[in-house]
Amino acid sequence: MKAKKNAQICFISSDTRDLYAEDIFRVMAAPESYIIKFRYRYELIKEVNRIKENMDVIIYSLVGTHSDENKLELIPIRKAKIKDIEKQNDFIEYYLELKEFVILTSENKKIECEKIPQKIVSIITDKNLEVEPCLWEEKVEELFALDNNNFRDRLMYKIEKLEVRKFCERWKNVPLKGKNTYVCYSNSDYKLIINLKKSSDKKSSDKNYILNINCDKDILKDILEFISLDAPRDKVTNRFYTGYFNTDQRYSQLIFRNPPQKSEVENSNKYDFKINIKLKKRKFYSILFGLLIGILTAVTKYNGIITFSKVWNKSIPEIIDYSFLPLIIGLISVFLFHKYDKK
C-alpha cells in the first residue's frame, strides 16, 4: 500500500537523550548527499510496511521534552530519501540520503502539541506539516531561537564542500551500510570548506566557540586541528594534501567535534560527526613509468641492441618483434612499480 500523494514521512529525533540530539547535529553538519543511519525498535514505527526504499522523508527535531509538555515544538530540519532499509530481529535500520534544509511554510508557523506524531517514524497527512526549502543559515537561526534546548550553547557548522584542487577530480560518496566514504589519491591537494555560525545572544557574545578536527596526520596533512570562531559567522577554507604511502589503498577519518561552552559539565557529549576517507595510490605515475620503459625498450631494440630474432635465429613477424616485446615489458614495469613503489 502506497502513501498518499500529500502524505509526509516523518523521522523525529527528540532532545530527551544526547544520542538523539546528536542526530540533529549530524544532520545539520553533513554535506549534500551524505548517508545517515537511523536505528529504531519496531514499536516506535507507525505502519512500518508502508515505508519503502526511495521514498522521500523529512527529519524533524522535537525540542522541549525536558520541560512542560505544552511547550513541545516540532521543528523540520532537512529532507532526505530512503536509500536502504535493513530489517533485523528487534530493530530496523534506515539509511537516508540527505537533501535540502526546510522550514514550515509561512501559513504554518508552529505545530500544535496535539498534532505532534506519537511515533518516532510516522506517515501523516496534516497540512500543518507542509514545508518549503530554506538556507542552512536560516535553519540555524531557528534552532538558536528555541527555548529549553542546548543548540544555543554550541557552535553550529556544516561541511559545505570537499573538493579537489588538481586534476579536476571530485570526491565520490559511496553509501555502503551508512558509511560515507570519500575517495582521494596520494600526493594530491584538496580543499575543505566549512560554514560556521554561533548564537547572536548577548550571553554568548563573549564565549569562545571551537570546532575540533581530528584525523591521521601522517595521511592527511595540514588539516586544521581546531577552528575558533569569534565573529557571529564565518566560512573557513582549509587546504590540505595527501602524502605517499606504501599500500594500494588506506583508510582514514575526519572527525568533527563541537564541545559545549559550559566547561563545568564534565564528560559532556561532544557530538561527533565523522567522514570516512579512502586513499588510493595514483596509477598515473606507474603508467608513465611503464610507458617510458616501453619506449626505451623499443628504441634500443630498433637500434639493434636487443634483437631476440637474431639470438634465437627465428623468423618473427616484424610487427610483433618490434611492438609486442616493448608492450609486455611496459605492462610488467607498470605492475612492479605500482606494487612495490615505497614512496
Segments from the language model and where they lie:
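N-terminal "first-domain core" detector
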Residues: 1-43, 177-182, 187-191
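Structured alpha/beta reader/binder surfaces that contact nucleic acids or chromatin modification marks
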Residues: 25-111
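Contiguous surface segments at macromolecular interaction interfaces
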Residues: 93-178
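Contiguous beta-strand segments within globular domains
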Residues: 166-200, 206-212
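Short, hydrophobic beta-strand segments
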Residues: 228-249
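Cytosolic-side membrane-insertion boundary helix
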Residues: 248, 255-306
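Hydrophobic alpha-helical transmembrane segments
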Residues: 312-328
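Membrane-helix interfacial anchor on the cytosolic side
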Residues: 329-343
